[in-house]
Amino acid sequence: NGTLYFWDHFAAVSHVLRQYVGGYAMYNLTGGVNAISDDYRINNSFAKGTKVPSQYISVAQGFFVNTEIEADPRGVDSNINPVVGGDVLLRNNQRVFERDSPLGSSIFFKEAKAKTTATSAGGNKKVDTRSKIRLLFDSPNGYHRPLLLGVDERATNNFDVGFDAPLAEKNNEDMFWLIQNAKFIIQGVPNFDKDQEFPLGLKLSKAGLVRIKIDALENVANNVQMYIKDKSTLRFYKIN
């Protein structure tokens, strides 16, 4: 489906599956987003996924690809045609020497001590000047879901392979972009015109306080105003 999924295990080091504290960070042509966090319900470390995938993938860094659009398509009335798959091509000219973050632009999703003092090549890094809106959703049960909405002239408001990242997890509570009735974590769109509306979906396991806020803005003009529209009450809430 055009998205890379990176497992980020950011707390509670254990080989016991139910003690895992982590989630899937994602990256595609629109950009990267860090993993969902739900740690406080498992232990009291309050750890969060903070690593955002970028242009470079570290040596030995594993990732998943997927042809599914929906993690759980049962009962979903999506009008997106299935992705039938194809070839994943890794070309030699994509290779570059780049140091791991924070000294470089490469992200490795496992904590390790730096063992090198070499200097990165840095010659192939592209400066991203596209506009991006990063939202953060806090659920009643403590899930923290980051979402990305980004502008790219090659994208549309419908599903675009490589620009829209489908939800790959089945969480008890979550928030996601709705594109043609399917769920996405990253959405690429052609513009941020003032008449644009981008549907959001919520999944909750109990009643309680829900927070939706702007986590970060990238290359967005200061005079742009953003609102959350409650579809049931038709009320608007300014969030910037």
Language-model features: where?
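Compositionally biased Ser/Thr/Gly- and acidic/asparagine-rich
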Residues: 1-240
